[in-house]
Regions:
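Short acidic-hydrophobic sequence patches enriched in Asp/Glu that either
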Residues: 58, 62, 105, 158
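Short acidic loop-to-helix transition motifs that present clustered carboxylates
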Residues: 33, 83-88
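Glycine-rich, histidine-containing beta strand-loop boundary motifs that form or position
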Residues: 28, 38, 55-56, 83, ...
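Short alpha-helical segments and helix-capping/turn motifs at coil-helix boundaries
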Residues: 8-11, 86, 169-170
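Conserved small-residue-rich beta-alpha loop and adjacent elements
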Residues: 1-77, 144-145
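ALDH superfamily catalytic-core signature
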Residues: 67-74, 78, 88-90, 94-96, ...
Length: 189
């Protein structure tokens, strides 16, 4: 993807005269309760989907709170929140009304959704680039959010600011937060 292609796609949903939309399934990991609604907002307001959030059983307790907070969107039919385990998630991933999936979680869950259960058939699918999932999926898996420090002439205050933010991100990751930075890369000229 080059800059021109990225700019052409930026906010492209808003330029469509008759957007297609559809139902986006949000499968949130259980460690950060704020991520599923944030992912739903992105799918709704940036990409034009109505959303179905399937709560992780670890965070089912926050579902009623989200239902109350998001009642205006739920009442108008733009959002639903459902509960259950992996069986419910598997059913929803294959439901004919689901047009898009976003998952926050493990690569094992992602691969189960995209390629199927472990075994010879999964390996065949991977080798042939033939996923069992035939709809788009976006994934935030196992914390693959590196921080890159690019070469620049930084002032001391800028370096201190960057350092504080990196320490905060790494500290957050002690909680297993998929959105915090686990890796730090230095780019040399």
């Amino acid at each position: 993807v080059d800059l021109a292609a990225a700019r052409a796609r930026q906010a492209s949903f808003f330029a469509q005269k008759d957007p297609t939309g559809g139902v986006a399934l949000i499968l949130g990991a259980g460690n950060v309760s704020s991520i599923p609604p944030m992912d739903a907002f992105t799918k709704m307001f940036v990409e034009g989907f109505v959303c179905l959030i399937k709560m992780n059983p670890v965070n089912e307790w926050v579902g009623p709170i989200l239902e109350k907070a998001l009642a205006p969107m739920i009442d108008r039919g733009y959002l639903r929140i459902v509960y259950g385990g992996g069986d419910v998630g598997a059913y929803l991933c294959k439901h004919p009304t689901v047009a898009d999936i976003h998952i926050t979680g493990s690569d094992a869950t992602h691969d189960l959704i995209v390629w199927g259960p472990p075994g010879a058939e999964r390996e065949r699918r991977k080798a042939a680039h033939d996923p069992q999932l035939k709809i788009p999926i976006s994934s935030e898996l196992g914390n693959v959010s590196p921080v890159a420090i690019v070469p620049w002439t930084y002032r001391d205050a800028e370096l201190a600011f960057i350092a504080r933010n990196i320490v905060t991100m790494i500290t957050n990751n002690w909680l297993g937060d998929l959105a915090s930075a686990p890796d730090l890369g230095f780019i040399r000229e």
